[in-house]
Regions:
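Conserved phosphate- and dinucleotide-binding cores of soluble alpha/beta proteins
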Residues: 79-189
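N-terminal active-site beta-alpha-beta segment that forms phosphate/nucleotide-binding
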Residues: 1-115
Length: 189
């Protein structure tokens, strides 16, 4: 299957989960993540605010705050097709923008560079065990991560993990997958 077909097939599976099923999976993935060494060692974490059928990241964000971690969320720049991350400490620092996305208000948040973050939780829809992913099709994270060494993880239910994701030269794999069954260290190449 090509990327578009895989994205569509897995999105449909995710949308069929009941709220209770989804919540139970999110609790398990959050537990796996926050017990991991990569989480424990991180002081500043980049994470996406969930929208629609995506895995809800609120429990992860709030766990980070309780543990004294700095939490950063992205703001998309659609003209430049890039991401800028901002540290936020309260949901009042967010605004609703296009596609009903919640993003930081730049005037109410501190912008951070990728090198300041210790861990980035990268969103996606389909993944393989080498860490390659199919996101939402904009390439924002691949551009953001190009040439960077930041630790990366993605939240991925086992139904989202396939044998092989079709790749292109600009695709940047993640280091680890966090599923409801545990942490998968990706084998790149």
């Amino acid at each position: 299957m090509d990327k578009a077909a895989l994205r569509k097939a897995v999105t449909e599976k995710l949308k069929r989960l009941t709220e209770d099923e989804k919540h139970e999976i999110e609790k398990k993935m959050t537990d796996v993540l926050v017990r991991s060494e990569v989480w424990k060692e991180a002081k500043m974490i980049g994470i996406t605010l969930a929208n629609g059928f995506e895995w809800d990241t609120q429990a992860i964000i709030e766990t980070g705050w309780r543990q004294g971690k700095s939490i950063c969320v992205p703001k998309c720049d659609p003209k430049m097709m890039r991401l800028n991350f901002y540290r936020f400490t309260d949901y009042d620092q967010l605004e609703v923008v296009y596609y009903n996305l919640r993003e930081p208000k730049p005037q109410a948040s501190e912008r951070v560079e990728i090198g300041q973050m210790d861990l980035l939780i990268v969103p996606g829809i389909v993944f393989d065990r080498e860490g390659f992913r199919i996101g939402f099709g904009g390439g924002y994270y691949d551009r953001f991560l190009e040439g960077q060494t930041i630790q990366t993880v993605s939240l991925a239910h086992s139904m989202q993990i396939v044998d092989k994701v079709p790749t292109e030269p600009f695709d940047v794999p993640v280091d680890r997958l966090v599923s409801e069954k545990g942490m998968v260290v990706c084998k790149k190449g």
